[in-house]
Structures are given as C-alpha cells and as structure tokens.
Amino acid sequence: GLKDWWNKHKDKIVEVVKEMGKAGLNAA
C-alpha cells in the first residue's frame, strides 16, 4: 500500500525535497 511505498522511499523523497527547498530559496 501507500504506507509501504512511503516507508521505502521517504529518505530519498526527503533529500529531494530539501534540495528543491534550497534551490527555491536561492532563486528567490
């Protein structure tokens, strides 16, 4: 289910979100 998918990928997702956040702050 979705929870299993999230648990499998959350570390990578968090890293990507952090990078996107940094890029957004730098662009602003």
Swiss-Prot record:
Post-translational modification: Occurs in 3 forms, M-PONTX-Dq4b has an amidated Ala-28, U1-PONTX-Dq4d has an amidated Ala-28 and an oxidized Met-20, U1-PONTX-Dq4c has no modifications at either Met-20 or Ala-28.
Record carries keyword Secreted: yes
Residues making up the signal peptide according to the UniProt record: none
Positions bearing Alanine amide: A28
Tissue-specificity statement: Expressed by the venom gland.
Any single biological process term in GO: defense response to fungus
Entry superkingdom: Eukaryota
One cellular component term from this protein's GO annotations in UniProt: extracellular region
Main localisation: secreted
Modified residues (Methionine sulfoxide): M20
The protein's role, per its UniProt record: M-poneritoxin-Dq4b: this synthetic peptide has antimicrobial activity against Gram-positive bacteria B.amyloliquefacies S499 (MIC=0.1 mM), L.monocytogenes 2231 and S.aureus ATCC 29213, against Gram-negative bacteria P.putida BTP1, P.aeruginosa PaO1 and E.coli ATCC 10536, and against the fungi S.cerevisiae, R.mucilaginosa and C.cucumerinum. Not active against the fungi F.oxysporum and B.cinerea.
Protein name: M-poneritoxin-Dq4b/U1-poneritoxin-Dq4c/U1-poneritoxin-Dq4d
UniProt source species: Dinoponera quadriceps
Upper lineage: Eukaryota, Metazoa, Ecdysozoa, Arthropoda, Hexapoda
